[in-house]
Amino acid sequence: MSGTKWTDEQRQAIFTKDCNLLVAAGAGAGKTAVLVQRIIEKILDKGEPIDIDKLLVVTFTNAAAAEMRERIGDAISKGLDEDPESKVLRKQLTLLNKSNIMTIHSFCLQVIKNNFHTMEIDPNFRICDETEGILMKQEAIDELFDELYEIENEDFINLVESYASRKDTRLQEVVLELHRFAKSAPFSYDWLLNMAEEFNVGEEFNFEETPWADMIMEDMKVLLHGFKNMLQQSIDVILNSEGIDYYYEPFKMDLSFINSLLEKSSFKEFRGEIIAYDFPKLPLKRNKDADKEAKERVKKLRDKVKKKIVELKNILDSYENEFIKKEFIFLYPSMKALSNLVILFDKKYEAKKRERDLIDFNDIEHLCLSILTDKNSEGHIIPSDIALDYRKKFAEVLIDEYQDSNLVQEVIMSMVSRVKGYWSFYNGQLMFNEEEINLEEPQICLDIPNRFMVGDVKQSIYRFRQAKPEIFLDKYNEYSEEEGTKNRKVKLFKNFRSRKEVINGVNYLFKQIMSKTIGELDYTEEEALKVGASYGEEVKGEPIELCLMDKKYEISEEVLKEYNVDEEEALDNIQLEGRLVAKKIQKLVGNNLEGGLKVFDKKLGEYRNLQYRDIVILMRATSNWAPIFVEELAKEGIPVFADTNSGYFDTAEIKTMISLLQIIDNPLQDIPLLSVLRSPIASFTDDELIDIRMVNKNITFYECMEIIYRLYKNEKLDSYYSFYIEDENKINKIIKDMNEKLKNKICSFIEKLKLWREKSIHIDIDEFIWFLYVETGYYGYAGALQAGEQRQANLRILFQRAKQYAKTSYKGLFNFINFINKLKFSSGDMGSAKILGENENVVRIMSIHKSKGLEFPVVILSGTGKNFNMTDLNKNILFHRDLGYGPDYVDTERRIAYPSLVKNIIKNKIRLETLSEEMRILYVALTRAREKLIITGLINNMDKTVEDWLNLSEDKNKVPEYAVMSGKTYLDWIGPALIKHKDAVSFREELKMTSELSNIVDDKSKWKIELWNKRELLKEKVEEDEVEISEKIKETLMNLEESNYKEEIYKRLSFKYKYDNASSIPTKLSVSDVKKQFILDEKENTEELFKKLELRKPMFMEEKKKISPSERGTIIHLFMQHLDLKKAENEEDIKEQINRLIEREFITYEQSKVINPYKILKFCRGELGKRILNSNNVNKEMPFSIEIPALEIYKELDKEIYKDEKLIIQGVIDCYFEEEDGLVLLDYKTDYVNDIEEIKNRYEIQIKYYEEALNRITGKNVKDKYLYLFSVDNYIKID
């Protein structure tokens, strides 16, 4: 059925059957299309069709499941169009609604709901909110600690003394973190107990035979390979230099020693040889003909190797068996106590959930696992009867994004797949054994494997969620590519997304830096991406750009003097990079004039000008960087949106509302109270707040207000307040002297607060918050501020959070505030509300993780000079899923504390795994680009850094693994790989690098390395400041009183510039401004255009809000932008589209009333609507900028002087569409029409510039121009 031309490899992935099939699909390889096609071929097979509900398809997200279901539905529908009588197709279309295409969590929930009777859970269970779970966990751990303190549990007390700080919160954090970590293990109690038992060693313990010892040896061998390269490089220099051949023998001995170590497989031998080795002394011969530079160079290299070997000796010397044994024996009680403490906590937390009939997200997988597994008499984990039923039911189990599976999910999938074998614990680790097991009931078709797994281990970036890429890698290394095998793999590495320039660059870089050590996979030619996309020859691809700037660049005194600034005023590093990126974007986009980048539009099937929406800025993390980048881009007039997960709780409107809720709960909190008092909710001035505080400095601010309130109201003070008042007469005098307006203000606020406190008890929290929005007018006030739409959206999010909270098992304002605080600190804040649609023409800033699965014409990867986050390595107890616990050794009696030897091993292992994850994250970032890739980063001391890069270029094919292991930033990897590339020659010359490179790589990838000048960016900042300062000076002079200098000041200020008229010409005009200018030229009396400005109340203070004509026009334009004409056959369809905009909060219900479905339908059924429907190229709300002569607008200017003056016209075209013989331009108008000719004259000039913009941007002829008038439901053609 599919018209797609599949590659041979794709066909293998689609049609191979009767085996376990692993599909390794590189970035852009079309894995989703292949997976969908495989399903379609299965259900429409003419020989043995499989009903779609007999397939289990597991996806990573709900969106992916929905997309897959939609694609399959489209394919079936297309088949029915071709064969309407097909019973098979009709059946599959019916079964599609109950198909098992879902996320792993959805499948687990299905299993639980169908088999709840086998578990001790209520069938009406609810999945608890994440923050509700956090609150319950905190309750559980507080209660558990209190109980253990009360009974004075000795193990617990020792644990607190060893691993808690002054408070026990640090130990609580350890327990909560270990609990979360353990839940990624299939049988978490077993894992916890096994990891503690690793410390329970006897006299026979031999560290040299443990996995830890092997790990130390393998890690050190990576470094030794680096030392080997350095020594080999030195020997090459000795043999090719004059007069230093006497160095050859000692260097050869050193190299033999390193080679011998690399061949060792026994830790004991390895350790012994390193400790025993003494470097031979270098001969002290003097040879006047010796090449001194070469001699010094090899000595330096050898000294470096010697120093590193001494460090390894010292480390290995500490790994003495008896010492390690004593450490283990000492730590065992604490580690056992820790495991037991986590188990006790889990049981208490489970009890709390059961009381409320709740389960959390971890429970979903673990409950499913317990339903699907049994243990046989030998203790092996085998499928339960329920799992066997699923094995019979599912003809095939298909798993998407397999590289992101964790071990719990892997065991679950193995239980419902037809695989031979069982799971069992070996040395504390759960492992799969592919052996025959005896099942009481013979398994149907067990001999025919039925598992399909697709993913890309190079894109496994969710280790922080306990994803285990080793699951994929183990199969990838074991499975065969040969046909007919039971376990087979297929490789899809042809990339159908990116230009060859992007692919070649990605391949070059990762061949240089990715390995089994860092990245967990060797990036060989076999693993490399292959070019599959065709972009034609019309527009040539561009090289990948690397834009670097030295953040420690010293600014000379001359420069500081020239620009009159202090060095401290220089832009900070993030600002610098943000400004650099803004400049790159400006150059890429241009002003829709000449010079902008052209990109291929898949929908149009042709090249067009680059738009802002085509660009994404990717960052490793957006929390601190994105807001600064947004500011820098906005300064350059670049529309931008940052998709962040932070900043929400720092917005003024949310801080104010949370402060209000805090004082309603408890007004005796000075900081939130003052926040509310200074806000528009209460509007107290600083002077008024000082007057209130003067009542008494020793009590809370609210108590001061309460005293004023009571005395002013002639109420008697109770004993509590009397206690704090030493001199009541003095207080009375203060209050008597107080401004009457202030006293009334205080009384009004106190009374409101008391009313709010009372009301908060009687209504749900979500209703109460909305009541406060309306009662205080704060929601309306926020909307009237700059970025009001965003602020109101943030307030709605708080309301939604309250609604979510109201459904939990917690009630009341106090608990809601705790709920918000836990959300703030445990979930790492949240991003502000999203108010932009997917098609808005803005540059997007997002994290690399959020970009996974997406693609963009232009990708800018920024922040590559930022250090990797290794803060987790500093915790006092580390956890590793395979190696277990890595605690500090803490002896409270002797007051000794240091990292245990096993902690150092685990710390290094986690560091390597983190670096591997960072490597894959970098791969994901670079493979998002379709046509253009730009990398930006700041370097600390450019000259030294580049010199270090050059020293790592001895191997042209690979950056040394030890160098990659020691990398702290992405640039530490990218730099050494690129510095030896042929395209780096000019960059090295620019830096005056004299070192000769013998290993220049002549690779087909194309790179452009730019060194950006910090001085130029500093200059721009100074120029901005000069404008601001001149405005302030002008303002100061305007306020000068009469003085002896009046005449001189007047004379200087009255100076008239020769081209003064030009200064009044704006550099940019909107089309509306142009229209007004032409009307002004025609009217002698401008009174109608510029009426007296009348101040009016903000909308939120008015009793009734009426939508203005301009707002009405905006709403209708917004609806027309989002109108889908294909789904607008009747008024009900129109209403449904209106409701969708309301749901997505693009418009409110009140605003929706101005959209008349009947009028919209008339447009859709009219001639223009039909023509739009028939067009294959329809564009809406297209912004533009075009350059025109200033004389064209300002005809009064001197033609000779201003003949070369230009200005930019900006506007937004409502709609244009393409027909065979040209473009059709359409502009919507909601004005009331008296005279058709008047309307034509009014908008003629506007349409003229729209036409000119379209001509320039598209290069195509505009054949027709129309105004559609909604007031009369008709259109006017503009000649």
Swiss-Prot record:
Coiled coil feature spans: none
EC code: 3.1.-.-, 5.6.2.4
Alphabetized InterPro entries for the sequence: AddA (IPR014152), DNA_helicase_UvrD-like_C (IPR014017), DNA_helicase_UvrD/REP (IPR000212), P-loop_NTPase (IPR027417), PDDEXK-like_dom_sf (IPR011604), PDDEXK_AddAB-type (IPR038726), Restrct_endonuc-II-like (IPR011335), UvrD-like_ATP-bd (IPR014016)
PROSITE patterns assigned: UVRD_HELICASE_ATP_BIND, UVRD_HELICASE_CTER
Cofactor(s) the protein requires to work: Mg(2+)
Keywords, comma-separated and alphabetical: ATP-binding, DNA damage, DNA repair, DNA-binding, Exonuclease, Helicase, Hydrolase, Isomerase, Nuclease, Nucleotide-binding
GO molecular function: 3'-5' DNA helicase activity; 3'-5' exonuclease activity; ATP binding; ATP hydrolysis activity; double-stranded DNA binding
UniProt domain UvrD-like helicase C-terminal: residue ranges: 526-853
Record GO biological process: double-strand break repair via homologous recombination; recombinational repair
Catalytic activity from the UniProt record: Couples ATP hydrolysis with the unwinding of duplex DNA by translocating in the 3'-5' direction; ATP + H2O = ADP + phosphate + H(+)
Domain (UvrD-like helicase ATP-binding): residue spans on this chain: 4-499
Binding site for ATP: 25-32
GO CC term (a single one): cytosol
Superkingdom of the source species: Bacteria
Family designation: Belongs to the helicase family. AddA subfamily.
Role noted for this protein: The heterodimer acts as both an ATP-dependent DNA helicase and an ATP-dependent, dual-direction single-stranded exonuclease. Recognizes the chi site generating a DNA molecule suitable for the initiation of homologous recombination. The AddA nuclease domain is required for chi fragment generation; this subunit has the helicase and 3' -> 5' nuclease activities.
Name of this protein: ATP-dependent helicase/nuclease subunit A
Gene name for this UniProt entry: addA
